Amino acid sequence: LMIFGIRANLVETHVPTNTEHPARQLVSSFREFFSHRQSIFGLLMIVLPPAGFMSIIAVSAAMTVEIYGFSIKQYGLIFACAGIAILIGSTVNRWLVTRFSQLQLIGLGAGLIFAASAQLAVIAYLDSAPFWWVWFNVCLFMFTIAILLSNSMVVALDPLPRIAGVASSIIGTIQNLVGASGALLAAVIYDGTIRNAVIIMATVGLLVACIFLLRPLIAPGDLVHHPDELARD
């Protein structure tokens, strides 16, 4: 059904070429991607947050049931709150993108993720907190994901209209690797304490905020935005 919908409604604007060997084309696309500092900035803002939310997904059941004593049924409802937070974030982002620039929205996302992560860092330091405080910050982190990742993707791909497909694949692959690494690390270090349950999410969020503050060094100057026509061959 999805393939039929794409064939029926999606108009291809790019003319494919087979003048270059696929392997060389992939290598040249990697070089092109990492030659743009704006794309590197966008990549960092995209690939780091999954390490945080995948880490809490990996240990949330154990934390909720073992540490806080909720039942499995209650955990299902609690976990659903994180998913609802993403949905709400997506809805809010849909309204915000018509009123603010991508960089402003990335700044908003960085600020919100810092607010959540700073509190999680305090919780990790104390190694004790009421459940509502922990899960509120987890949901705030997830709410921010919907704003941060979508706008960072636009920033990362804007300088690369001719290799946008390969560029998005590069980002997606690295994102999955980092997310899986966060989940594996969380599973390894989890020892039944609140500290080790939230420390990765807290660290990643603080790192994302630092990267945003370092944007003038990572990608100095105004962000590049190409008109749609450049993507049409």
Where in the sequence are the language-model features?
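Juxtamembrane intracellular "pre-TM" segments in multi-pass secondary transporters
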Residues: 11-43
